[in-house]
Amino acid sequence: MVTVNCFLSEKEVFIVRKKSHILLARYLADQMPANESLQSHRKAFCLGNILPDIQPSFVTKRHEYFGTFDEAQGKIRRLVQSGAGYNDRVFWRRSGEVMHYIADYFTFPHNKTFDGTLYQHNTYEKHLKNELKAFVLEGKADVYTEKEIHFETLNQLLQYIKEHHRRYLNCKRNIDDDIHYILTVCYQVFQGLFQLCRKNGIADYAYAVM
């Protein structure tokens, strides 16, 4: 009985995380209505946003900044520099994987400033999912997306992520802070990724980003 209860609890946690990442993916895709490639491959983008949580490595590797940022940087770099070698479906799926990691970096329980229990971790993420959903569905999310930043180089984009995470770690955070950082940073990184792809002349899917 104990084993079954634990299994169900873990399953419930996965469902909460899955819903949060898909919600964010749909919101980001909605910010690019003119991008026909993205709109045609929304499912691939959403899949990418949950893929890191269903891979075997999830069991042994926490999705926190200091443990996975090198990997995330590599994914961003490959999209910007070698994205022309991917078909549209793969491009958007891998873009979704990047956004998954960025969102996790600005989720309090995924950071060293969080000292709560596993139960508190899971409860926090459940409340975060509900609050994030309310912000998006009520049309409040746009308040947390700053004016689009123009990144001239890949290094500028990576430094943007590093600097915002440094600020994020200045103190213990809460759900309101997380919503602000997740929506703001994910939006800027998503836009910046395709600015750089477009600048490098990578495939049609990078041209209609606005």
Show the residue positions of the predicted features.
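N-terminal leader/auxiliary helical segments
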Residues: 1-97, 102-210
